[in-house]
Amino acid sequence: METATLVAIFLSGLLVSFTGYALYTAFGQPSQQLRDPFEEHGD
């Protein structure tokens, strides 16, 4: 394969991995530990 193809595949995989990790952090098991500043506000 050409270098440009390998770089494109690597960057695409990196983007997909980062997106998956962000979704897991937002909606998965670790999301229970996140605080919600809107619920903490008393108004």
Swiss-Prot record:
Membrane topology: Single-pass membrane protein
Disulfide bridges in this chain: none
Superkingdom to which the source organism belongs: Eukaryota
Spans through the membrane: 7-29
Secretion signal span: none
Keyword Phosphoprotein appears in the UniProt entry: no
Record keywords, A-Z: Chloroplast, Membrane, Plastid, Thylakoid, Transmembrane, Transmembrane helix
GO BP: photosynthesis
Keyword Iron found: no
Pfam families xref list: PsbN
UniProt-annotated location(s): Plastid, Chloroplast thylakoid membrane
Cellular compartments per GO CC: chloroplast thylakoid membrane
Family: Belongs to the PsbN family.
Role this protein plays: May play a role in photosystem I and II biogenesis.
Protein name: Protein PsbN
Gene of this entry: psbN
